[in-house]
Amino acid sequence: DYYCWDEPILAPAEGTVVARVDGLPDQPLGEMVADRPAGNHVVLDLGNEEFIFLAHLRNGSVAVSGGQHVDEGQEIGRCGNSGNSSEPHLHVHMQTTPELGAGKGLPAQFQNYRANGALKLRGEPVRGQTVIAVEDILK
């Protein structure tokens, strides 16, 4: 059981869908495939040479189409375990081009979260931190 499994994945910002893949199977736990590393995924063009990848979505859950404009907070799919993934999770990656791994990586800013218990109004979580959205704390 994984908390994130089949949870809705929301667009983190307004943008245009420039790539989407759906129909790849979710992997059995602990098994990974290297030939489609992102699995089912969506790439949003945020403008200003900023592209965000939302990867490892659940098979059959991608809810947006290529060229579609999406609003911040709009559901784009559901959390899964497709692609090169050993367990359900969402992979978020920002870079300067729409092709995975082809561009320069960009820092991703988040708002209203706690990192290791400390409230952050805006910042960049780092490896090893436990991160909780403020909205989840209030529930």
Please provide the spans of the model-predicted regions.
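Short, small/polar residue-rich loop motifs at catalytic or cofactor-binding pockets
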Residues: Y3-W5, V62-A63
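Short histidine-centered loop motifs in beta-beta connectors
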Residues: L10, E50-G73
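Zn2+-dependent peptidoglycan hydrolase active-site motif and core
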Residues: E14-R58
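Acidic, glycine-rich catalytic/binding loops that coordinate metals and/or anionic ligands
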Residues: R36, A63, Q68, H93-K139
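Histidine-centered catalytic micro-motifs
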Residues: L57, E87-T97
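Short glycine/proline-centered loop/turn elements that form peptide/ligand docking sites
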Residues: A63-S65, N81-P88
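Short hydrophobic beta/alpha edge segments that flank linear recognition/processing sites
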Residues: D71-G83
